[in-house]
């Protein structure tokens, strides 16, 4: 994904692991970008990012406190935005089983709120981050992300004559992201490590690899 000097970008979940890496990459590669908005509900993490990216050095960076469950707040944040990267989600698999409606409210209803808010504004492209767990899901988290994916892809069929494209990007486990196994290993580095799930193997991508990846968007995404 490339941005021009006039690009106005908003990232939901902008204070998360991916969001922080995305913001840093965009500011490094496209320092002349017109606007980059971090949309998230975590006030403390926004403050921490403001210390990392001071406004004196990065005047194009803005912070917007809000929740994707709130469509009206989303609509306000999207004013003047042309590109949206959707990274906001609840993602802890065990937590989803005990709090199913909370995951549905954020991952499914939140996605629909974003779709409708984008259709009501001048956004021209939306990239939603997904997960390999949405393919043939075996848990509630994966099921909510599959529903989210379907909502974004289906939005291409209801956009009418609006110049907007919705896309979904799926990737696997990300090393170093919040809730991944790497931070757990680091926290246990001074203790004895018990080996569990000896028969299971997983593939994982580095956070840098994910945030460095270029996504090619077509004006009319292929539906499958």
At which residue positions do the language-model features occur?
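NAD(P)-dependent short-chain dehydrogenase/reductase
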Residues: 140, 146-209, 220, 224
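Rossmann-fold scaffold of SDR-type NAD(P)-dependent oxidoreductases
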Residues: 12, 78-87, 128
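Conserved glycine-rich Rossmann-like NAD(P)H-binding loop of the short-chain dehydrogenase/reductase
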Residues: 31-45
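Conserved residues in the N-terminal Rossmann fold of short-chain dehydrogenase/reductase
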Residues: 40, 64-65, 105
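Conserved Rossmann-fold NAD(P)-dependent oxidoreductase catalytic core, especially the SDR/UDP-sugar
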Residues: 86, 90-150, 154-156, 164-167
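N-terminal Rossmann NAD(P)H-binding glycine-rich loop of SDR-like oxidoreductase domains
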Residues: 8-27
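Conserved Rossmann-fold cofactor-binding substructure of NAD(P)-dependent oxidoreductases
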Residues: 62-83
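Short, conserved SAM-binding/catalytic segment
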Residues: 49-58
């Amino acid at each position: 994904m490339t941005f021009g000097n006039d690009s106005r970008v908003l990232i939901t979940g902008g204070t998360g692991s991916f969001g922080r890496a995305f913001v840093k990459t965009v500011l490094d590669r496209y320092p002349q970008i017109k606007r980059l908005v971090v949309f998230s509900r975590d006030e403390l993490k926004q403050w921490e990012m403001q210390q990392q990216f001071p406004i004196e050095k990065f005047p194009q960076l803005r912070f917007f406190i809000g929740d994707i469950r709130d469509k009206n707040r989303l609509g306000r944040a999207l004013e003047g935005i042309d590109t949206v990267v959707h990274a906001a989600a609840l993602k802890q698999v065990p937590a989803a089983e005990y709090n199913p409606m909370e995951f549905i409210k954020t991952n499914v209803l939140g996605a629909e709120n974003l779709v409708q808010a984008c259709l009501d504004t001048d956004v021209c492209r939306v990239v939603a981050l997904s997960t390999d767990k949405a393919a043939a899901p075996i848990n509630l988290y994966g099921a909510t992300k599959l529903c989210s994916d379907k909502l974004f892809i289906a939005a291409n069929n209801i956009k009418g004559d609006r110049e907007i494209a919705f896309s979904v990007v799926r990737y696997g486990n990300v090393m170093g992201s919040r809730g991944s196994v790497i931070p757990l290993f680091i926290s246990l580095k001074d203790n004895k490590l018990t080996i569990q799930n000896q028969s299971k193997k997983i593939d994982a991508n580095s956070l840098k690899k994910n945030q460095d990846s270029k996504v090619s968007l077509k004006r009319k995404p292929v539906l499958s």
